[in-house]
Swiss-Prot record:
Subcellular localization(s) per the UniProt record: Cytoplasm
Domain ATP-grasp residue range list: 133-327
Cofactor(s) the protein requires to work: Mg(2+); Mn(2+)
Lineage: Bacteria, Pseudomonadati, Campylobacterota, Epsilonproteobacteria, Campylobacterales
Matches recorded under HAMAP family: Dala_Dala_lig (MF_00047)
Designated name of the protein: D-alanine--D-alanine ligase
InterPro entries associated with the record: ATP-grasp, ATP_grasp_subdomain_1, D-Ala_lig_Van_CS, D_ala_D_ala, Dala_Dala_lig_C, Dala_Dala_lig_N, PreATP-grasp_dom_sf
Cofactor notes: Binds 2 magnesium or manganese ions per subunit.
Gene: ddl
Gene Ontology terms describing biological process: cell wall organization; peptidoglycan biosynthetic process; regulation of cell shape
Coiled-coil positions: none
Enzyme class: ligase
Cellular component GO terms, alphabetical: cytoplasm
């Protein structure tokens, strides 16, 4: 399978997406194409040998061939004709906005481009933490109780401390604050509202444990990664979450009973099916008093969570093989033909 990796985007996680693409290049041992989306949403074809941080930090990528998107794929302008970028499947590796909020999914679906990643509806529901909680509840998966704070509105609801405040529409740990008492609340709100107009507030639980599970559906069967127990801090910050996929953090496989492992997998299945078909996702769960709670859905996890799989390359290739393209509607204009000769025709 010939893959193209799409990365970058107009996102707070733009640089992390670059790191993720470089990391994935080292993991997938096959011929790859690299498509960089800059902050102005222009696409560039990056040669494999130039996939390094300097290419992007110095804006040297602007010297590379610019691509444009149209029906069936990415193209560049040639002397006499347009040249199509040869790839069989695009991996959506844009983290945060653009890649996870539905923009790229809509673009690919519109132009009939085969891709690994969440589709439009899945993107919308997983990118907004409030909608994620509502979706989880609808499929029978628990989440922690929460309160919403809206910019410009005075909430009359009494908050319990300590609490954790998160921007509703950010794909990572950006803008998150742990508030231990009321005197720190206004500052935390100001930080959160810098990134989003809606904030999710949850009671902070000291005795809670976090577990990560990635997977996908291939040929109607679930393929799961190992279950990871992240190193424990108050919460994983931006740098911690994304250095793990580059091999800088020690992977800790969770020491759980078979009963709890099955509970996690069952919750994952409820979240995934059928909404996330065609995507390899990671779900971050909490376990509290032997009950499983969904924390968040990562529809485009860092380097697609390769570090959690025993045979990541086979999983990725097999997933790509079975992704169908949306069937196009055939327009025959029969109705317009039928009224074409009538009096008072359109």
């Amino acid at each position: 399978m010939k893959f193209a990796i799409l990365f970058g985007g107009n996102s707070y996680e733009h640089e992390i997406s670059i790191v993720s693409a470089v990391a994935l290049k080292k993991v997938i041992n096959q011929n790859l194409e690299f498509i960089f989306c800059d902050e102005e949403r222009r696409f560039y074809h990056i040669p494999s040998e130039k996939m390094n941080s300097k290419t992007f930090s110095t804006k040297a990528y602007k010297k590379e061939k610019e691509l444009f998107i149209q029906q069936g794929g990415f193209f560049s302008k040639g002397f006499l004709k347009e040249n199509k970028l040869e790839c069989e499947c695009v991996i959506n590796l844009i983290h945060g906005g653009d890649g996870e909020d539905g923009k790229i999914a809509a673009l690919f679906e519109f132009y009939s481009i085969k891709f690994i990643g969440p589709r439009l509806e899945a993107s919308v529901l997983s990118f907004n933490k409030e909608l994620t909680k509502l979706y989880a509840k609808s499929v029978g998966v628990k989440t922690l109780d929460y309160t919403m704070l809206r910019k410009g509105q005075n909430s009359k609801e009494k908050l319990r401390f300590p609490c954790i405040i998160k921007p509703a529409r950010l794909g990572s740990s950006i803008g998150i604050s742990i508030v231990k008492d009321e005197k720190d609340l206004e500052y935390a709100k100001d930080v959160g509202f810098e990134f989003d107009n809606d904030l999710v507030v949850e009671e902070f639980k000291n005795n809670i444990k976090e577990y990560n599970l990635a997977g996908c559906v291939i040929n109607d069967k679930f393929v799961f990664s190992i279950i990871e127990e992240p190193k424990k801090k108050e919460f994983l910050d931006f740098e911690q979450k994304y250095l793990s996929f580059s091999g800088h953090n020690e992977l800790i496989e969770a020491n759980l009973s078979e009963e709890l492992k099955e509970k996690l997998k069952d919750s994952f299945k409820k979240i995934y099916n059928p909404l996330f078909k065609g995507a390899l996702i990671r779900c971050d769960f909490f376990i509290l008093d032997n009950e499983v709670y969904l924390n968040e859905i990562n529809p485009n996890p860092g380097s697609l969570a390769n570090y959690l799989f025993k045979d990541f390359s086979t999983t990725l290739n097999t997933l790509a093989d079975q992704i169908p393209l949306e069937k196009m509607i055939k327009i025959n204009y029969n109705f317009l033909h039928s009224i074409n000769g009538q009096k008072g025709k359109l």
